[in-house]
Amino acid sequence: MQSSIPLKQSHYHLFKGLKVLKSSHPEVRKIKRQQSGHSAHGNKVWRSSFVILDYLETHPLQENSCALEIGCGWGLAGLYLRKFQNISVKGIDIDPSVQPYFELQNTINGCEIDFEACSFESLSQQTLSEYQYLIGTDICFWDELTQPLFDLIQKARTAGVKKILIADPGRPPFWALAELCAEKLGSEVITRRIDKPWKSEKYILVIT
């Protein structure tokens, strides 16, 4: 699928082969004007998304597998996996207003990925059993999210999910989650740095 949407170079970052739209793009600005608000901070691309793309380039997932991107926002991680690693992907986000951004970002990059507006707490073990990978970026930003995310991780492991990746700039709720996972599940946290499109250092919780 080829995009017919006009795209000036000043309106996107080119990163790991993806065109990542900036807020200055006319279609992005149009969506923002049409919407009244965002309930869960989904109206921008968070920098942890770029760092997890860098990680996925170095540590590719198994081809022809399935991944679920939780709290997907504009869906960059899933888009990268679909476009470059032949992974079947679905994105979910509690905020339905991110869907136009998600679809625009996919169209610009010539992909189609399913989106569903739902919370990660609503995911059943049966649903999780359809995926080998679970990915999230900047999803642990409130204290009250730590325990539900830990419960989801445990449920996903029971369902047979092979690998879980959660990227974050290092907020206290993320470290609380990482501590829980290290104690109960033997996880690790990786520090990852990128130099472009900005210098940035983030952390990735890896659970296998």
Per-region residue spans from a language model:
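S-adenosylmethionine-dependent methyltransferases
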Residues: M1-T208
